[in-house]
């Protein structure tokens, strides 16, 4: 009897162990440790002169990723988990899990995990990004950072900030402004780096950045043809602040106004008893070329630049004149717009009027002392930028207005 009881107990143990083994076989298992033999590419793109870190997922509980070609998860420079082309992975709860099989790997809390593919194109949360990804873990949350070279970053910024259908010279000006902004906010210039671990965010708090899907051949050409060029003022980087349409076209040209009392204008021009001041013609760049000053007994026509000098205006040209009470209000373009930055719509209008990208940038960022320079970033070969030529007026038959 005892023998039968012992045999029955032994059979029960075998059944339980088999059941546990079957259950264990259904559970996801950690990745094998031989990944290093299959991966022959680094965890981030080579030849990055100026790496940019963009926080594309900010303190969220999860994210989804995929790779364009075979990839891997790295800790430092060591690959620990293979990523297969065409499969989707979830990052959550301190691990990366392959949806199709349940295969996973745990991520260390004290180190950044890096995700890269052979061609350095990675999908994350419905968008493709150039470069690679970095994962930072916080208690119950995680951040995904897109790591890439500044020039590749700009390929996703320029079409996100300015329509690709716009004039190529405006797109080039946008590329330089965006590059200057990014360059000025790398490392110590970033307000996000200390607490969040990245340089920039991909929205209007810094610059719109929609990744690889936003790219076009035309905007990529604008980036390539201005490669490495930034704005500098007295040897310091000038952050390329810019904005969309604000007010009318004249406001985008850094419009300023100066009221001149009637008596003062009479003394300056030598026309007594002024009854009217009229702009009779403009050049293709909106500068007044012929201003008529009418008195009761005398009329004089003055070239716009000369009258601006007579009035003591620091300007490239007078734009308009209107009478207000006992004064004449002259609207003119200021010497630059370093505080407000590039107007995107204004830049496109100027480009359509024949301005090149250097002239557009000089218009919006130059200060009264003329210290603005277009120079290469420090690690690019240094070329002293020459002062851009003055805009050339087109024939009236070529004007768009």
Regions found by a protein language model. Give the residues of each.
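Conserved, single-site charged/polar hotspot
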Residues: 2-401
């Amino acid at each position: 009897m005892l023998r039968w009881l012992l045999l029955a107990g032994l059979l029960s143990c075998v059944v339980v162990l088999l059941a546990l083994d079957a259950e264990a076989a259904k559970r996801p298992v950690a990745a094998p440790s031989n990944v290093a033999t299959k991966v022959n590419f680094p965890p981030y793109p080579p030849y990055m002169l100026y790496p940019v870190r963009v926080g594309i997922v900010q303190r969220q509980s999860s994210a989804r990723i995929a790779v364009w070609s075979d990839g891997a998860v790295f800790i430092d420079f060591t690959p620990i988990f293979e990523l297969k082309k065409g499969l989707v992975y979830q990052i959550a709860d301190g691990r990366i899990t392959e949806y199709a099989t349940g295969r996973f790997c745990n991520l260390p809390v004290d180190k950044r995990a890096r995700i890269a593919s052979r061609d350095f194109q990675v999908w994350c949360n419905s968008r493709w990004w150039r470069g690679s990804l970095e994962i930072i873990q916080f208690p119950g949350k995680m951040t995904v950072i897109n790591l890439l070279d500044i020039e590749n970053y700009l390929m996703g910024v320029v079409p996100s900030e300015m329509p690709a259908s716009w004039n190529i010279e405006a797109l080039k000006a946008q590329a330089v402004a965006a590059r200057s902004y990014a360059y000025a906010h790398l490392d110590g210039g970033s307000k996000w780096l200390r607490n969040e671990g990245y340089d920039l965010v991909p929205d209007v708090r810094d610059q719109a950045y929609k990744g690889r899907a936003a790219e076009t051949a035309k905007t990529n050409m604008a980036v390539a043809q201005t490669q490495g060029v930034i704005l500098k003022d007295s040897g310091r980087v000038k952050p390329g602040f810019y904005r969309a349409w604000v007010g009318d076209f004249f406001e985008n040209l850094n419009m300023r106004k100066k009221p001149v009392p009637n008596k003062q204008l009479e003394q300056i021009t030598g026309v007594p008893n002024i009854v009217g001041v009229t702009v009779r013609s403009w050049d293709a760049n909106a500068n007044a070329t012929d201003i008529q000053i009418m008195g009761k007994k005398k009329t004089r026509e003055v070239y716009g630049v000369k009258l601006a000098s007579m009035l003591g205006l620091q300007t490239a040209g007078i734009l308009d004149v209107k009478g207000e009470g006992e004064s004449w209000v002259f609207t003119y373009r200021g010497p630059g717009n370093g505080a407000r930055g590039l107007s995107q719509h204004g830049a496109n209008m100027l480009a359509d009027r024949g301005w090149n990208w250097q002239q557009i940038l000089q218009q919006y960022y130059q200060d009264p002392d003329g210290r603005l320079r277009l120079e290469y970033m420090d690690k690019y070969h240094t070329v002293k930028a020459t002062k851009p030529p003055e805009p050339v007026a087109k024939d009236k038959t070529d004007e768009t207005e």
